A protein has these predicted regions:
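Generic signature of mature, soluble extracytoplasmic domains
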Residues: 63-66, 70-111
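Extracytoplasmic electrostatic interaction patches
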Residues: 95-181
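Immediate post-signal-peptide N-terminus of mature secreted/exported proteins
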Residues: 19-83
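Non-membrane alpha-helical secondary structure
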Residues: 43, 47-53, 57, 87, ...
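Sec-dependent signal peptide recognition
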Residues: 2-11
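Short amphipathic alpha-helical patches
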Residues: 59-67, 78, 82-85, 126-129, ...
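C-terminal motif of bacterial Sec signal peptides marking the signal peptidase cleavage site
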Residues: 14-17
Length: 181
């Protein structure tokens, strides 16, 4: 029985002494990988085709308004507010490219994180300061991805909200103008 306890203690000591010195960094990389995965899923839920269709509709509506709206008539305040809100759709022209660029950045960062994790698990990095530097660089990269992903998500939600509330009003103006002129 004494030999079993001594053997178990030696085995536990051996496991603890041989554990990876970068366990904390490996855990941090795992968290970063989860964050990047969440950003990727968030982006995949954003419909760039829907945004493109909103922009096309904006162009059609505004073309009719510019052509048929009488400039010297008194513009009611509601129309002015709605038209200003609707301009936000026009500003979203770079949405699709922004989404695609961020997805490329995510793919690159996922590879970098996987490589860093492998290097840490295999103890291929000999210096803890170097490991900390690499981890800090990847943390910065992931934080930038999170900021841009949240901004794209917020912009998408705003666009959908504007389209849902303002587009019907603007379309009714277009319909009225088409009937009059």
């Amino acid at each position: 029985m004494g030999h079993t306890v001594l053997g178990t203690m030696l085995l536990a000591l051996l496991i603890v002494s041989c554990s990876n010195p970068y366990q904390k960094e490996i855990s941090a990389v795992t968290k970063l990988q989860q964050d990047v995965e969440e950003c990727e899923q968030l982006l995949k839920g954003l419909d760039a085709v829907q945004v493109r269709e909103m922009i096309d509709e904006y162009g059609k509506v505004m073309a009719v308004i510019k052509e048929k709206y009488i400039a010297d008539s008194t513009v009611d305040q509601r129309f002015g507010r709605m038209a200003n809100l609707y301009k936000g759709v026009k500003r979203s022209r770079g949405f699709e490219a922004g989404k695609e660029n961020l997805l490329k950045e995510i793919a690159f960062t996922k590879t970098q994180l996987e490589n860093l994790r492998d290097d840490l698990e295999n103890e291929d990095i000999n210096n803890s300061d170097t490991a900390a530097l690499y981890l800090q660089m990847e943390t910065t990269s992931v934080n930038e991805i999170k900021i841009v992903a949240e901004k794209l998500h917020s912009n998408f939600e705003t666009l959908v909200s504007v389209q849902d509330t303002v587009y019907p009003y603007m379309q009714s103006i277009v319909d009225s103008l088409n009937k009059i002129r």
